[in-house]
Amino acid sequence: MAVRAVRGAVQLERDEAGHMEEQVGALLTAVLERNGLHTDDLISIWFTATPDLRSDFPAAAARKLGIVDVPLICAQELDVEGAMPRVVRLLAHIESDKPRADVAHVYLGAAATLRKDIAQ
């Protein structure tokens, strides 16, 4: 097994804890499904959130999905003028036999415009 990295992001419609849980949960589910992963394949997940998101930690959504024995961390995204608002990004380190080129990076909704080069 090799260590691979999976990127992903989702733009929230509003800064509410329940909405964040729903949207981050959908992002994590899509990352797992599109890459044929189980939670045992996860090594760690880094989350960032734009400074306008303050209602909850994105990692809380992962815990509610049952990802309880994987190291998670949250950080604030750089506050760049003109950047897309209300975005949660993730970088998941995984164990996989897939070649790096076959890893599916998941950008949901409007966040797909962030990385047109790798979004699937």
Language-model segments: residues:
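Terminal domain-initiation and capping elements
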Residues: 1-120
